[in-house]
Design a protein with these regions (language model features):
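Periplasmic-binding protein-like
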Residues: 115-123, 144, 183-186, 235-245, ...
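Flexible loop/hinge segments that line or gate small-molecule binding clefts
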Residues: 121-169, 207, 247, 273-285
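An alpha-beta-alpha
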Residues: 168-204, 211, 314-327
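Hydrophobic alpha-helical segments within soluble ligand-binding/sensing domains
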Residues: 157-184, 195, 199, 221-230, ...
Length: 328
């Protein structure tokens, strides 16, 4: 049996346009509505079955996100919910816990309840997973991705962060301040930033010391605390540290305090994201600001315009900013 995506592909319009046309929305012109209904009949699609199934999904947007425990994802969820509400959508949120199986199930669930649009926040590597890509292709809703860096599959709208330029800015800042022994800490989920860290160091002509790169399974402040403990146990620790994200930086600073050490006098600390706590700790954490508000605003605006027969997906890169505070 044909589905909404088949009709959309046949006519060269968005899935949301097909959905609204079949539901008799006044936002869709009479000519487009007739064209969609004719195509649905030709392909053997049951409009009556669709109306019954879609009732719960009318004017509903889905949000899929890995977790809500970290400040970064909690901020994105709140921003997305507020922006979608302002556009007249009610929202349904699903968590994946960074698991492929949970992501596939979440996408399938959103498709089954016929949400009109779906905002998925995930890492670029995760978004390239074959199971996840296939689930997105089967989904009956318009999809917007928010990812950590460039996403090569152009069939989906995507807002992505230019992580590379941000990390280069951060390392260059440390270099200009005279730091030479620069380390990096991360958890396994954010380990892609270590790869970029190494690339940035090489670009700037700096030496990467393998012993100064610490990765563990623990996340958040606890992960940062434990990784800093490892570095401080060395005979010669680094004189500056890039943390994969701000909550790890906060944990690293706690470990320094326990040893009566301070940033930047004993070790400079730089984070990534610019979460709320980064503005207050230690007089302010130097960090690479992720433009979350811009990301969500652009993403929701594009999703809302999907009903206007826009045919091609968009890939939009946003550059982060360096926020210099007292820890460097």
């Amino acid at each position: 049996m044909a589905n909404l995506k088949d009709i959309a592909a046949e006519l060269g319009v968005s899935i949301s346009t097909v959905s609204r046309a079949l539901n008799g929305s006044s936002e869709i012109s009479h000519s487009v509505t007739e064209e969609v209904r004719a195509c649905a009949e030709r392909l053997g699609y049951s409009v009556q079955a669709r109306r019954g199934a879609a009732a719960a999904g009318s004017n509903t947007a889905g949000i899929i996100v890995p977790e809500i425990t970290s400040d970064y994802y909690a901020q994105l969820i709140q921003l997305a919910k507020n922006a979608l509400t302002a556009k007249g959508y009610s929202t349904i949120i699903k968590l994946t816990e960074f698991k492929t199986s949970e992501m596939v199930q979440a996408i399938s669930f959103m498709s089954q309840i016929h949400v009109q649009c779906l905002l998925i926040i995930m890492d670029t590597e995760e978004a390239m997973n074959t199971q996840i890509v296939n689930a997105m292709r089967r989904c009956s809703s318009d999809i917007m991705l928010i990812t950590s860096k460039y996403y090569p599959l152009h069939e989906f709208d995507c807002i992505y962060l230019d992580e590379y330029s941000g990390i280069v800015m951060g390392i260059q800042h440390l270099q200009q301040r005279g730091y030479t022994r620069i380390g990096c800490i991360s958890d396994k989920i954010s380990a892609s930033r270590i790869t970029i860290f190494k690339q940035a160091m090489k670009l700037l002509g700096m030496t990467v010391e393998p012993q100064y790169i610490c990765v563990g399974s623990e996340r958040g402040e606890n992960g940062g605390y434990l990784r800093m403990k490892e570095l401080l146990a060395m005979k010669t620790p680094p004189d500056a540290l890039f943390c994969a994200y701000d909550q790890m930086a906060v944990g690293a600073l706690h470990a320094m305090h326990e040893n009566n050490l301070h940033a930047p006098e004993d070790m400079a600390i730089i984070g990534f994201d610019n979460i709320t706590v980064s503005k207050n700790i230690e007089g302010g954490l130097t960090t690479i600001e992720n433009p979350c508000e811009d990301m969500i605003s652009i993403a929701v605006s594009i999703l809302a315009k999907r009903t206007k027969n826009r045919r091609s997906a968009q890939q939009i890169a946003l550059r982060p900013n360096l926020i210099v505070r007292s820890t460097t």
